[in-house]
From Swiss-Prot:
Its cofactor is [4Fe-4S] cluster. The lineage of its organism: Bacteria, Pseudomonadati, Thermodesulfobacteriota, Desulfuromonadia, Geobacterales. One of its GO terms (molecular function) is lipoate synthase activity. Its EC number is 2.8.1.8. It comes from Geobacter metallireducens (strain ATCC 53774 / DSM 7210 / GS-15). This is Lipoyl synthase. SMART domains: Elp3. Belongs to the radical SAM superfamily. Lipoyl synthase family. It is an enzyme of class 2 (transferase).
Length: 283
């Protein structure tokens, strides 16, 4: 297999020394972030600015997606004290906007939806001015779980399609149609919900496939979109097939906006929660 080398313009430096303050707070409160667990390349930038995407419901996932660095092992039961600790961290950090996500928890009857709702309620109590964005799994398409999340009334609810339908073998246990169904159901449950999705590029997708995903997302009422470059966390993960140049991301951004998205972030380092407050500014 040919190894695609990372171009010079995609070399982002990570400075662990800049993480100390945030890591101290997270350690004290026994919290996880997707920034750490997913080996996000933006971690230094975000931690330096005292921003973080909180990972609730533990750090172990019940699925085996070949692109993801989150641990694949038997998950622990939900921690009933976690919502309050997340809320305390947000209060101390003084966050105006926060993103909450989790591993997929197919082992739980509601997929963890109730824990999400409890976390939103705790944040509202501790930090009423903070707007909350949730990035949720598919809950196996369970409408009751989705209704529980919608009823918690976050500012934005995200669910990522991740890639084009042809490449869905990288998402073990997922289904493209089901993910579109999640976004459709969110809109059915709350016609004014602000929904969001994300797609990674560089996995071998064709441009026409990407544009078709944009159209599919708009057809189910998706409001916001993030487009970023896939970066393999390690050699054992799914390989990068192509590094997409910045000008292509700009072209995709223009195409997505033309289909009717209210806001689009598109660039090599864009991730679902990267610059998340920019989407919130569209509310």
């Amino acid at each position: 297999m040919t190894i695609v080398r990372k171009p010079q313009w995609l070399q982002k430096k990570i400075n662990p020394a800049a993480h100390a303050g945030m890591e101290g707070l997270l350690g004290e409160l026994r919290l996880h972030t997707v920034c750490q667990e997913a080996r996000c390349p933006n971690i230094t930038e975000c931690f330096r600015e005292r921003q973080a995407t909180f990972l609730i419901l533990g750090a172990a996932c019940t699925r085996l997606c070949s692109f993801c660095n989150v641990t694949k092992q038997t998950p622990i039961p939900p921690d009933p004290g976690e919502p309050d600790r997340v809320a305390e961290a947000i209060r101390r950090l003084g966050l105006s906007h926060v993103v909450i996500t989790s591993p997929t928890r197919d082992d739980l009857p509601d997929g963890g939806a109730g824990h999400y709702a409890e976390t939103v309620a705790a944040i509202r109590s501790a930090s009423p001015a903070t707007t909350v964005e949730l990035l949720i799994p598919d809950y196996l398409g369970n409408r009751e779980s989705l209704a529980r999340v919608v009823a918690s009334a976050p500012a934005i609810i995200g669910h990522n399609v991740e890639t084009v339908p042809r490449l869905y073998q990288i998402r073990a246990g997922a289904d493209y149609g089901r993910s579109l169904g999640v976004l459709r159901t969110l809109r059915e449950l709350d016609p004014v919900v602000r929904s969001k999705s994300g797609i990674m590029l560089g996995l071998g997708e064709a441009e026409e496939e990407v544009l078709a995903v944009f159209a599919d997302l708009r057809s189910v009422g998706c409001s916001y979109l993030s487009i970023g470059q896939y970066l393999a966390p390690s050699k054992s993960h799914h390989p990068v097939r192509e590094f997409i140049p910045p000008e292509c991301f700009e072209r995709y951004r223009a195409a997505a906006l033309a289909t009717g998205f209210a806001h689009v972030e598109s660039g090599p380092y864009v991730r679902s929660s990267y610059h998340a407050a920019r989407y919130d500014g569209q509310l």
